[in-house]
């Protein structure tokens, strides 16, 4: 009890101690270069704009000391975003301070364990802080129904989407909240400008992305990598006869080249089944080998004979995008089965999928009762968790690198529910005294 009272009175001091501990652990670890890091440092064509610009700005200012500067700046961005996120939640959701201290520690875990995002030159280093800020402002708009908070959310979301496009699901979720707020407060006309901005945001992001590549790489096009990731799961479940769905000789030749290599290396679903392996584990283990190690190099080799390196990458992206949709349609049941398994893998198992769906429906069912911020928060954070994994599962393997952004959500919901039970129990005891 004394500890809880101390935390309650000295919350800022306790958070400061957590921040100092995390900072020490980050500073004593060197910054690491991952296989993807060079693409951001050298501003590769297949990288979205924000993080390469961030890295190269730091490189231009700090020169040989850029790694240390990156580590410090990435840590500071993280600490600032966590602090803002926690302080805003404390203002609008009444929980015991102890729960918020625990939540702060959980939000800081990606900086000291497993991902160590401040110590890596990867998009996660700034995507995570941007994600927390975007989430916080959407929650504030949901709580307070002030369009100022929505404006801030859209600004951070714009930057976030130019860092990692997997967060596009915030747009439909934002539209639903905006319609709900407008209906509830009868402010449809007043909210039309924000509605227009939300609808146009994906197009503005696409235009900005293309403009960036025109300025930096000389090509007015979106970051060319989408088609490769869309085609990879479709190729995993394909069979040799699927070449017949294509009418273009170019697409037929590309399909045959990809399929032959995948089959020879046992990267496809048929190999997993014949070897008695778990399909989703086999897919997760081989996704990068299919996408980055097979589809891309085969296309690169084919098209670089006649095109420049950048033009060849654009051609690969266009061709793989065109090939993906017909192949998915032709094998839709198998593709859908793989998608569902990949989606469930992102939650670790299907029971957690069911749990998150139940929690989401619970939150939605309670948003019209008194003290709704708790239930709005439950509905929103479970919805973004489900949406994130749902969109990642379409064209990626659902590794923690792409799903860790919401690892805190289940803890947060449990803290809300435990606090509610505790508060109800204490109130009930007082009435019997």
Stretches found by the model and what they are:
Residues 150-164, 201-204, 209:
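Membrane-interface alpha helices of multi-pass inner-membrane proteins
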Residues 72-94, 129-137:
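Transmembrane-helix motifs of polytopic, lipid-linked glycan transferases
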Residues 85-110, 128-129, 148-152, 379:
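Transmembrane-helix signature of polytopic, membrane-embedded enzymes
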Residues 26-68, 222, 316, 332:
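Extracytoplasmic catalytic/substrate-binding loops of multi-pass membrane glycan-assembly enzymes
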Residues 126-143, 152-157, 175, 409-413:
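Specific aromatic-rich, kink-prone transmembrane helix
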